[in-house]
Each structure stands twice: as structure tokens, then as C-alpha cells.
Amino acid sequence: MSTYVWQYLNEYREERADILDAVETVFESGQLILGTSVRSFEEEFAAYHGLPYCTGVDNGTNALVLGLRALGIGPGDEVVTVSNTAAPTVVAIDAVGATPVFVDVHEENYLMDTGRLRSVIGPRTRCLLPVHLYGQSVDMTPVLELAAEHDLKVLEDCAQAHGARRHGRLVGTQGHAAAFSFYPTKVLGAYGDGGAVVTPDAEVDRRLRRLRYYGMGERYYVVDTPGHNSRLDEVQAEILRRKLRRLDAYVEGRRAVARRYEEGLGDLDGLVLPTIAEGNDHVYYVYVVRHPERDRILEALTAYDIHLNISYPWPVHTMSGFAHLGYGPGDLPVTERLAGEIFSLPMYPSLRPDAQEKVIDAVREVVGSL
């Protein structure tokens, strides 16, 4: 049987009754758009984070777009983020007319190197956008200190780190707003697309709710500020309500898979396993490892019917769609080096032990033969 980085069927078979009941609940409610399930999920997701406000949207990319717009970010502004991220992080900045500015990442944990932030803040900088990557939290203390010093907004990208903590603080609870994705692969994933923005600020939440609904305010069909059609689907919201109750269990399942990888692969020369940043409680959205012979390893593993991913093979600043930003080879040396060495092993809480052992045995054989 083929082995892939992620699949949902094991989880669905375990939770099928609850998932189908969620669908039935929505269909029987008579509310298909912005109904009880969306409102309840928003309340429960906000409460999970200890925050007063949550706005459900249609996907994680638009969570970032609406988050930026609600914080007043637009044309002429610069937003500082990383290039070692999923492209949608940067696409969202471009979508609001702002300019992405990149900072390099840490060699050890691949997170934003906050020690370099000051060097890229300029007169047009208006927002810092840290990405909590692969399941770990960025060190928010220097981010918040610089934001306060320079009067900048902070939008956290939490798409890959639901439930992650650093020094006890949940991701998404320290910035002016935080964007989440519920793409099916996520730690908290829907059975389709979904996203949300959480915030402690009532005015930001008011703007978000208008922006997700064409820009309409109190009067239906009257647009105050042109917005988007970006509503969280009612069925997905009800599924997410059920899954939110199991989020901590999903995280523990991922950590168990990670522990087995550490036991089975920790002694292999040249293979670098994830390093947990100081104070972090890793939730292992993906299990990213490094090896200088990455491409040879991936090719060899296909003979074992094991098909792995790279997160991410092309840094965003090297993509043709962002050539106008003027970055060149060597501008972000750590990011560029990592892109040639990292790859992801299968990681999801319903990964069967026999499937994981197959991966461990194959990786040991391939890496050991190099």
C-alpha cells in the first residue's frame, strides 16, 4: 500500500458517525449560511484562545487578507514576514496592495529570526506577520516589543500551529489579530476549506464581519467599504465544532507519532530531526527533517512506495511571481539552504503504527546506504 505524508480516511472512518451527524444537524436546522453552527463555532474557537472575538471565513488565505485589511494595511505599506512559508502568506500581503519584506529564519528551528527584524523595519513598515511554522510558535516577545516601539500592527499566521504554545501562551493570542486555516491537512482541519480570524479588539472584529460579507454593514445590500464574499460554510463550521473538542487529543496523537520517529531515526548520521525551540510545545503539523542528500533520499523512497513532500521547495522570494520585489540569490541564505535539504515524513494522528514502521525502516535503509 502506498504511503503519503497525509490522508484523511483513517480519521474519517473513526469519526464517521459524528461527521455525518454534523451534516445532518445543519441540514435539519434550515440554516445554510451564517447560521447557528458558524456563530457557535466562532464563540467556541474564541473561548479556546481566551479571546472575545472570532470571525469565521472561507479559507486561511482570506483570513490573512481580511485580517490585514481590518488592521488598516493596504497600498504603500510594507509587511515583514518570512520567505520559508506557504506562498499564500505572501499572496495575501500582495492581495491588499502591500509590499512583502522578508527576514531570514533560524537554522535550527526554521522559524522567523526575530533578532534580524530591526534591520528590515523601514519608514513604510506597518505590520509584522510572524508565521508559526510547522507546529511551533515564533518567539513573540521581540516581535511585540518592536511593534510597540515602531507603532506597528501584528498579525499572526497560525495556519500551521493550532493549539501550539510558547511559555504557556497559545499562538494567536498576542497580536492585534491572528489568522487560522482549517484546510483538511491542518491540526484542526475541516472536510473542505475554512478559516478564521481571532482578535481581542471589538473594532477589528466589526470590520472583519463587514469585510467577509461584501462590506455590508447594518443595512443589507448597502456596502460601506467594498469587501469580499468570504463566509465560513455552515457545514464546515459544525464539523469544526465537533473536531475542536478533540483538538488536544489530535495534538497528543501527533506528538506520539513524533516520539516514535525520534526513537526510530534519532541515531541516523546526517538526518536532522525537528529541533524544538526554547519554551515551545510543538504540535507537529508536519514532521520536517533535513539531509544534504534530500533529493536522492526522496527518489530512493519511491521504490518503497513512499511518497513524501517538501515544505517548501521554493522560497517565496525566489518565485517568478515575486521577482518584482528585487530579491536575488543569497539574500536569505538560511532560507535558501533549507529549501534544498528539508522534507516531511508522514504526520497525522491516525497514522497506523505499521505504516509508520514502514517509513522508519525505509528511511533507515536509504539513509544508511548513502
Curated annotation (Swiss-Prot):
Alphabetic keyword roster: Antibiotic biosynthesis, Cell membrane, DNA-binding, Membrane, Pyridoxal phosphate, Transcription, Transcription regulation, Two-component regulatory system
Q: Which residues cross the membrane?
A: none
What domain of life does the UniProt record list for this protein's source? Bacteria
Checking InterPro entries in the record gives: DegT/StrS_aminotransferase, PyrdxlP-dep_Trfase, PyrdxlP-dep_Trfase_major, PyrdxlP-dep_Trfase_small
Q: Where this protein primarily resides, as one coarse class?
A: membrane
Q: Where is this region: Hydrophobic?
A: 53-158
The protein's role, per its UniProt record:
May form, with DnrI, a two-component regulatory system for daunorubicin biosynthesis genes. This protein probably acts as a sensor protein.
Family to which this protein belongs? Belongs to the DegT/DnrJ/EryC1 family.
The protein in question is named: Daunorubicin biosynthesis sensory transduction protein DnrJ
Q: Which organism is it from?
A: Streptomyces peucetius
- State the taxonomy lineage: Bacteria, Bacillati, Actinomycetota, Actinomycetes, Kitasatosporales
